[in-house]
Amino acid sequence: MDRKESFQIDISTGYYCKGESILLGGAMLDGECVPDCYVKIPLKTMNRHGLIAGATGTGKTKTLQIIAEQLSENGVPVLLMDLKGDLSGLAQPGEEKDFIIERHKKLGFPYKAKAMPVELMTISNEKGVRLRATVTEFGPVMLSKLLDLNDVQSGVISLIFKYCDDHKLPLIDLKDFKKILQYSIKEGKEVIGAEYGNISSSTVNTIIRKIIELEQQGAEDFFGEPSFDMEDLLRIDKQGNGFISIIRLTDMQDRPKLFSTFMLSMLAEIYASFPEQGDSPKPKLVIFIDEAHLVFRESSQVLTDQIEAIVKLIRSKGVGIYFCTQNPTDVPETILGQLGLKVQHALRAFTAKDRKEIKQTAENYPISKFYRTDEILTSLGIGEALITALNEKGIPTPLAATYLRAPMTRMDILVPDEMDVLLNNSELIDIYEDTIDADSAYEILKEKIEAAGKKDHQEKIRKETNTIHRRRSEKSTFETISQNTMVRQVGRTLARELVRGFLGVLGVSTTTKRRKRKY
């Protein structure tokens, strides 16, 4: 048996699929496409996560497009996080250009152009379905990360969330959160301090300044209601194609912390809301995270551990996560080891550090008797990639240098008129377009404080009126004895009782307790 026949048997056996699969392209040997030697990925293993990596301009985005459109065609909804703004073309069919026809001639199957059902989404002022979350849903850990707080400040955030949970104060937007922070060091200082521990005014003021800074970056557009229902990511069109939801994040390039925290929050929400699914013929949802290095670059070790835990557990919910980045080393090893599909485009070696990273990358792939992995990594052309995946039994497939098929959809962006048509036909735009300003912590606390202030003011007027109508002789007597120490003490007691009356309206306990540690 010659080398080529041996290669054909290895690839055909390794990538054989009984069930549904997606076709990425044809396997190559010595730089040439081998006939009838296809690289297929079983749909049932697409919830085992994956990586698409490679230098700029080598075709990562087109590979993402190829996988996403075939998932959609097989009835699997897809969520794409688009930081570069070049994925909207999925909504339009591709064009049968000469180079595409020639590519498919080499592959041995005809090119097919097809548009996919696409929903454009946004967390900012870009056009699209508005994605929002309440501050409560975001949670104290994510919010602390977003605000870049230290441990002491994060502790205060957790305390405030606990207080709001216990007292049924909805935290919907940043306005609510600023209000409860101000309340914690003013009108509600004693009740919160007595029950949960005292809070330093300087710490709270620092947190409020950071929230204002966040608002200036446009974060107030993200927090609010109606919050997005994750079930709306799972829609199927009338033809049985899964919707491709594209979150437009082009204006997030200079705000990686907001993007990464949003992404982590969304993954956590999906994990919490989706039921257990176990092994199934195909995934319920597949998520692609473009520019993944931004996520991990901004993550503390604690948050990286959380991502690792989510990646490990979320596949039981039928969800696959795919990271797209320039270099596999951008993804922590603990997460890299959990990724079933690896698509590696060419890497460029300009420095000694680059060459070292290429050798390190080569070690992450199965040993092949047909390739020198570290050498082929630098010689792959545009639209070519090294691929290894998991077969239907969960066993790693042989390493295959693959000549990738062309996307069925447009390899360019939508023009403004096409985008407007797409948005006008959206079933979700009207549901999420307008912000709902329901009664929440801001309104509840404001009403509470105003009511307490009004009652205190009325009490003050009543006492002043009684004093004016006293007889002059009584007033003189009071003036005479007011210098007495006992009388002054009685006066202080009366004042303290009035304060208790005022604080009682606010629900504030004035019982003296042991002083608790300040945060």
Which residues does each PLM region occupy?
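Long amphipathic alpha-helical segments used for membrane anchoring, targeting, substrate engagement
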Residues: 459-519
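Conserved lysine of the Walker
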Residues: 60
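N-terminal pre-Walker A segment at the start of P-loop NTPase domains
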Residues: 13-38
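The conserved Walker
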Residues: 52-56, 299, 328
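Phosphate-binding P-loop
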Residues: 32-35, 39-47, 239-240, 279
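Conserved P-loop NTPase motor module
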Residues: 1-14, 28, 130-136, 343, ...
